[in-house]
Amino acid sequence: MAKNVVITGATSGIGEAIARAYLEKGENIVLTGRRTERLEALKTEFAEIFLNQKVWTFPLDVTDMSMVKTVCSDILKTVGQIDILVNNAGLALGLAPYQDYEELDMLTMLDTNVKGLMAVTRCLLPSMVTANQGHIINMGSTAGIYAYAGAAVYSATKAAVKTFSDGLRIDTIATDIKVTTIQPGIVETDFSKVRFHGDEARAATVYQGLEALQAQDIADTVVYVTSQPRRVQITDMTIMANQQATGFMIHRD
């Protein structure tokens, strides 16, 4: 029987790749994200390719707590049991010493990467507890392990994701719910373009001189982690580019 997979931040990059990977595996997917037009475009595209899977779309801004509650309730009413939740929505904004950081950028990262992730989990977790099964994937980052210059807030948010996942695993120990933190290194997506507020030239320098990870690499990892036997729980998975040793210790050609 096909599983029902909810993916936040599914309109591009890693989230979109995860959606495609689960559809290729034969699962049903729930796409959520802020860009309604992109959600509908993906739904149309997927419907033409994956004829036997169900695709639902729900516009969602994870920083809007009221919206999170409403949308999660609608998802449960429409889809039924959720087997896998992929908390992928997240972002970095800016790169500067903490004392010079833009307050709005800081708050947006905290609201999205931490509060939003926790809010979605809080709304969908009770149904998993009732069903005594489920798998929660929380998207962390190597930045949560290795802080680097100019990214104190982003690193802190991703460290929080890791710690939250560990606590959640403890709280659900008496159930068959699994919790995994995925911690990617440098992945070539629109991540840096978003971080630098649309500055494509600056974003491109992040990936120069190295073969960065691709969104598909992370998607394949997520599917692998959630495809293990019931007895196996992979708690953490760290994936870095071959030219990346730690955080921003990178060898560039």
Label each region the model flagged.
Residues 96-98, 105-107:
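Substrate-binding pocket helix/loop in short-chain dehydrogenase/reductase
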Residues 181-185, 201-248:
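C-terminal helical subdomain
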Residues 141:
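Residue(s) in the substrate-gating loop at a strand-loop-helix junction
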Residues 11-13:
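Conserved glycine-rich cofactor-binding loop
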Residues 58-71, 103:
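The beta1-alpha1 cofactor-binding region of Rossmann-like NAD(H)/NADP(H)-dependent oxidoreductases
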Residues 25-42:
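Conserved glycine-rich Rossmann-like NAD(P)H-binding loop of the short-chain dehydrogenase/reductase
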Residues 121, 157:
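Active-site helix of classical SDR
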